[in-house]
């Protein structure tokens, strides 16, 4: 039996059109994390710098989910490497 997939906007609809396909449980988990982000991720007309920060944060969330599902520490390291860029993008605005 195939799992049903849903499209997930990695940075929220207001910040990017980039999407990935996720199974429903993974989409729900990622969305729960996304809802804890800086409230500006829900705003329209964010600056490009802020949008890029949320894109990086979305990629980080995907990498962390992959780490949890596979126990492959490489994904954790990749996610961790994005923290500086995310912080710089979100704090500078």
Describe the predicted segments one by one.
Residues 26:
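The canonical Cys-X-X-Cys-His
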Residues 1-22, 30-42:
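Histidine-centered nuclease catalytic patch
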Residues 59-93:
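Short flanking/linker segments adjacent to small metal-binding domains or redox-active Cys/His motifs
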Residues 34-69:
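Charged, amphipathic alpha-helical linkers/stalks
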Residues 16, 21, 52, 81, ...:
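Generic serine detector
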């Amino acid at each position: 039996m195939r799992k049903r997939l849903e499209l997930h906007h990695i940075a929220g609809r207001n910040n990017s059109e980039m999407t990935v396909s996720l199974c429903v449980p993974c989409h729900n988990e990622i969305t729960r994390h996304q809802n804890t982000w800086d409230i500006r991720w829900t705003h329209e007309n964010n600056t490009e710098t802020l949008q890029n920060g949320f894109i990086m944060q979305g990629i980080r969330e995907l990498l962390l989910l992959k780490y949890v599902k596979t126990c492959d520490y490489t994904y954790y390291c990749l996610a961790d490497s994005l923290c500086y860029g995310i912080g710089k993008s979100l704090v500078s605005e």
